[in-house]
């Protein structure tokens, strides 16, 4: 009987530990921890672009803002950047601005990436990850669509096709 009791006791302990680990894994990796939600005002920030110019989100009120959080080490980020560049000129004329927020990488690494893809939209580096933390961004890429009134319209996590980028830009294009 002693062996049987020990077996069930060990099995019970193992089950409790497994459930605890499973819950921890789920809450850390799958639960929506984003602080940015559709219908809320976008959090203001000021970051410098690669030319040293300050970009403040609040100053873009009146325009739709396509706020993309990315990293050079992120394959989906790398795939979506050419789509964003392709549509940037057309939608900039219609009142949509792209701001690509890099996740704290060295400026030289980011500049090489920008040069390789010929990106012309503003690229800023979130040194210290303050903006990423303020928006609760996990994982990369994440794109936040902000309308001309500074309100978050949509939060998209994951890569985007060219069609998705175009649909998202249409969604935040200011009304004429």
Curated annotation (Swiss-Prot):
It is found in: Cell membrane. It is a single-pass type II membrane protein. Disulfide bonds join 74-77. Belongs to the thioredoxin family. ResA subfamily. This is Thiol-disulfide oxidoreductase ResA. The keyword ATP-binding does not apply. One of its GO terms (cellular component) is plasma membrane. It comes from the Bacteria. One of its GO terms (biological process) is cytochrome complex assembly. The keyword Transmembrane applies. Residues 36-176 form the Thioredoxin domain. The chain crosses the membrane at residues 11-30. Pathway: Protein modification; cytochrome c assembly. PANTHER family: THIOL:DISULFIDE INTERCHANGE PROTEIN DSBE. It holds the Pfam family AhpC-TSA. Keywords: Cell membrane, Cytochrome c-type biogenesis, Disulfide bond, Membrane, Oxidoreductase, Redox-active center, Signal-anchor, Transmembrane, Transmembrane helix. Thiol-disulfide oxidoreductase which is required in disulfide reduction during c-type cytochrome synthesis. May accept reducing equivalents from CcdA, leading to breakage of disulfide bonds in apocytochrome c; following this reduction heme can be covalently attached. InterPro entries: AhpC/TSA, Thiol-dS_OxRdtase_ResA, Thioredoxin-like_sf, Thioredoxin_CS, Thioredoxin_domain, Thioredoxin_ResA/DsbE_sf.
